[in-house]
Amino acid sequence: MLLSRRALLAGASAGVLSTPALAQSSGWNRDAFLAAMRDSGRSIEISEGAFAAIQARRQPTLARMEAYLKSRFGEADPAVLRGFAELPREYFHYNYEARQASPSNAYETEAKPWALGFGSALSDYLGQAYMTQACQPKPDHVVLEIGTGSGFQAAWLSRIVAKQYSIEIIEPLGRSVQQIFAPLGLTNVETRVGDGFYGWPEVTGGFDTIIVTCAAQYVPPALIQQLKPGGRLVIPIGQPFRRGQFLYIYTKDEEGRVRSRKDMGVYFIPMTGAMMKTPAPAGSVPQ
């Protein structure tokens, strides 16, 4: 039996944040996990004992995340915690190039990135938590992600916002990850294969938030253009495969003026495509 969005939300509202919502729901068990994996085109075998061990690590992981966000922001956004709790992270641990699932790696004590194949990675959950809260997501928001990767960041934001878009430039990865949202009932996620440098201009009205999950050498002009007044762009900026990358927060006020703030040091794989071929426009590289 697959879990619908309504069932996920019902599980969340029935419990407390200290226990993940899917763990509370009778709908998420080993059989549901295997069915969702199969329906997303990713077969796997896992024992009851191994699946139970994964679930036992969820609550400690959520507690670590809450403590981390409080240490960074002064408070942990309940919507961010709830969004994480509503998702089975083990479902997203998959190497698409090797066609190999690794659910037992989920909810690791020391958060770290995991290979997805094709040069991409599932980011560590604490880094994803930080960027999610930095987005300041709200229930009526329309959000664009550049760099779908595993799909976990898009899925996480989809639990909080009205509509989530995501673009992946690596075609075999993007085509495969397009299949993983429906089996979890994530109907407000729309993805496509393309170059995130150009954003998603067909979306009428633009975006409340744009989150970039790869390191850009400068801010793509299209992303600023597609940001709504009052919108927010969260983007890592720095040179490819070098230290010294930083997260930047750009905001656009109601008059269209854009301001930026340098945030924490980060390390991401580079934005490819047009970013590598197009000279930086004047003023697009933060000082």
How does the language model describe each region?
Residues 21-25:
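Boundary at the C-terminal end of the N-terminal hydrophobic targeting segment
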Residues 132-253:
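Conserved nucleotide-cofactor-binding alpha/beta core module
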